[in-house]
UniProtKB/Swiss-Prot annotation:
Gene3D superfamilies in the cross-refs: 2.40.50.100, Nucleic acid-binding proteins, P-loop containing nucleotide triphosphate hydrolases
Localization per record: Cell inner membrane
Similarity section: Belongs to the ABC transporter superfamily. Maltooligosaccharide importer (TC 3.A.1.1.1) family.
Keyword list, A-Z: ATP-binding, Cell inner membrane, Cell membrane, Membrane, Nucleotide-binding, Sugar transport, Translocase, Transport
A GO BP entry: negative regulation of transmembrane transport
Protein name, entry field: Maltose/maltodextrin import ATP-binding protein MalK
Binding positions for ATP per the UniProt entry: G36, P37, S38, G39, C40, G41, K42, S43
Coiled-coil region(s): none
Cystine crosslinks: none
Naturally occurring in which organism (per UniProt): Escherichia coli (strain K12)
SUPFAM superfamilies the UniProt entry points to: MOP-like, P-loop containing nucleoside triphosphate hydrolases
Length: 371
């Protein structure tokens, strides 16, 4: 195991900057997930750690050693890619041992490591098979095993589940989580799938256009996003946003006017520092935090546009006439409502988020469980 530290790391191709002044501390044994939309720089960041991309400026440390100029093979890292990249003419055992053979490891060492890793990954009964005789999930486990037998101090995974179907992704996600708990290795995992990030990570790094938008535990990012980008990216369905105007402030409270015909005002328990009366801001509320109208004091009303029945839950898309914008309301169980009907939902102030015009969040003061 080893820690990984990035200090003011920047990557540029000519005048195009793809990673901007990245500062990160990844502790020994942590499972850290880099997440963000396509083009945010997450894979580039992973490749700089692996040594497959040069660092334009800044410093990378693995353990106590500065690694900027160290060749990839000498960094003590192992990498699993989106593509399995298995040799089709070699057996599972031969694929897993290929790197060790090239490194000149003794036969008994190779056999011992391959057998140990095969047991961990439930591949022992498949060691003599060729890749064409394996399922997608089994092939991905072989690719992971090939990296594990080298015993890297840092394990890098670049969207390893992207080629799998939905059921296999869930299965492999569970297996990777178990593998980390069993081995305790430092793992850095890249994905665009925020569900993978939330379920796997000890710590999530959200990237936006080459910069670190926020670093934190999964529930911390979900309940206390640093800005509107993180709020909209973490969570599915994504957070609803409403334009509001500040009408008053007090200690640890901000009053805003909702975009409804009755101009209803509501006090939100958020930090009021630097918030000016009259400012235009965005109120955020997650679909699952909206309430049935009969148990709420603050009511939003609109016309049902779409009803999505998922069996275990219902998602209702409601158009708010005054802003010509849809809100998504999610409720567990079945909700029977017709498209075109008028539908009212409740807005709980303690679950609301408030964002300034520049996108930064006013810190929520409501204490959420698990954070």
């Amino acid at each position: 195991m080893a820690s990984v530290q990035l200090q003011n790391v920047t990557k540029a191709w000519g005048e195009v900057v793809v990673s901007k002044d990245i500062n990160l501390d990844i502790h020994e044994g942590e499972f850290v997930v880099f997440v963000g939309p396509s083009g945010c720089g997450k894979s580039t960041l992973l490749r700089m750690i692996a040594g497959l991309e040069t660092i334009t400026s800044g410093d990378l440390f693995i353990g106590e050693k500065r690694m900027n100029d160290t060749p990839p093979a000498e960094r003590g890292v192992g990498m699993v890619f989106q593509s399995y990249a298995l040799y089709p003419h070699l057996s599972v055992a031969e694929n897993m041992s290929f790197g060790l053979k090239l490194a000149g490891a003794k036969k008994e060492v190779i056999n011992q490591r391959v057998n140990q890793v095969a047991e961990v990954l439930q591949l022992a009964h498949l060691l003599d098979r060729k890749p064409k005789a394996l399922s997608g999930g089994q092939r991905q486990r072989v690719a992971i095993g090939r990296t594990l037998v080298a015993e890297p101090s840092v394990f890098l995974l670049d969207e390893p589940l992207s080629n799998l179907d939905a059921a296999l992704r869930v299965q492999m996600r569970i297996e990777i989580s178990r593998l980390h708990k069993r081995l305790g290795r430092t793992m850095i995992y890249v994905t665009h799938d925020q569900v993978e990030a939330m379920t796997l990570a000890d710590k999530i790094v959200v990237l936006d256009a080459g910069r670190v938008a926020q670093v934190g535990k999964p529930l911390e990012l979900y309940h206390y996003p640093a800005d509107r980008f993180v709020a909209g990216f973490i969570g599915s369905p994504k957070m609803n946003f409403l334009p509001v105007k500040v009408t008053a402030t007090a200690i640890d409270q901000v009053q805003v006017e909702l975009p409804m015909p009755n101009r209803q005002q509501v006090w939100l328990p958020v930090e009021s520092r630097d918030v000016q009366v009259g400012a235009n801001m965005s109120l955020g509320i997650r679909p699952e935090h909206l309430l049935p109208s009969d148990i709420a004091d603050v009511i939003l009303e609109g016309e049902v546009q779409v009803v999505e029945q998922l069996g275990n839950e219902t998602q209702i898309h409601i158009q708010i006439p005054s802003i010509r914008q849809n809100l998504v309301y999610r409720q567990n169980d079945v909700v029977l409502v017709e498209e075109g009907a008028t539908f009212a939902i409740g807005l709980p102030p303690e679950r609301c988020h408030l964002f300034r015009e520049d996108g930064t969040a006013c810190r929520r003061l409501h204490k959420e469980p698990g954070v």
